[in-house]
């Protein structure tokens, strides 16, 4: 989920 909330978790 790049560019979403998960962007920080996903990388």
Curated annotation (Swiss-Prot):
Q: Which GO terms describe its cellular component?
A: extracellular region
Q: Does the keyword Chloroplast apply?
A: no
The answer to whether UniProt assigns keyword Lipid biosynthesis to this entry is no
Q: According to its UniProt record, where is this protein located?
A: Secreted
Q: In which tissues is it expressed?
A: Expressed by the venom gland.
- Keywords, comma-separated and alphabetical: Secreted
State where it is primarily located: secreted
Name recorded for this polypeptide: Venom peptide 5
Specify the species.
Brotheas amazonicus (Scorpion)
